[in-house]
Amino acid sequence: MKIAVMTDSTSYLSQDLIDKYNIQIAPLSVTFDDGKNFTESNEIAIEEFYNKMASSQTIPTTSQPAIGEWITKYEMLRDQGYTDIIVICLSSGISGSYQSSYQAGEMVEGVNVHAFDSKLAAMIEGCYVLRAIEMVEEGYEPQQIIDDLTNMREHTGAYLIVDDLKNLQKSGRITGAQAWVGTLLKMKPVLKFEDGKIIPEEKVRTKKRAIQTLEKKVLDIVKDFEEVTLFVINGDHFEDGQALYKKLQDDCPSAYQVAYSEFGPVVAAHLGSGGLGLGYVGRKIRLT
């Protein structure tokens, strides 16, 4: 048995990790109304993307990997001698990536494809990839890995803030926000992932209060966890994310592992300006 681990591009793993563990990536993409396309990779300058989004008159559209893209990756790994492929995907609640990866796996012969719905995005999705790789190295079988990731998912989550709900509403990536329409003037929405979907959690008066709310909600959840990895995931307001990262490093118990990451184009397109996330995993994740 030889097991590969792959993912889609919204896990936002560093190129060093991709190269070190030979992780195959199925890229998602973003397209603007003038035809400008950003296919996700570590070569994209995220500042250029945010500038383009700010100057665009319409919300960009996102595209999941085509089934053919998944099939090509699976066949390549099969031809390299892999018998099984663990595939970690962006939440099925906001993308069809999981469904297309699963369907492609049903169409490929000679290799067993095990698709896993992270029900999250960005580097929290990436944590499942890194955990799966660690378990492959330790000799676990595919079903044992999927079972462990499923258990890990019960102790994993994320909260988000954005400047407004415009992008999320127009892209259809938020659930249950209708009652908030027209009520967010001078208010900041606090959101969370619940069962793979982004839902409204709370409205607060200022960005400062919104960031404090992120921190309080997450730290209240993880206070009884034996192990914790926290992720500050930053958007285009660089200083806010850096300040929260430093504060958590200073404030959290030594048992906590605090890491920093950034949103890539696809998730940034859904969130719009001012996106900032704080995610948690009830494990110590190997990040190198």
Swiss-Prot record:
Q: Which GO terms describe its molecular function?
A: lipid binding
Pfam families in the cross-refs: DegV (PF02645)
Q: Which residues form the DegV domain?
A: 3-282
Reply yes or no: does the keyword Lipoprotein apply: no
User: What superkingdom does the record give?
Assistant: Bacteria
**What are the record keywords, sorted?**
Lipid-binding
Binding of hexadecanoate occurs at T62, S95
NCBIfam families reported in the protein's UniProt record: DegV, fatty_FakB1
Name this polypeptide is given: DegV domain-containing protein SACOL0812
Q: What is the lineage of its organism?
A: Bacteria, Bacillati, Bacillota, Bacilli, Bacillales
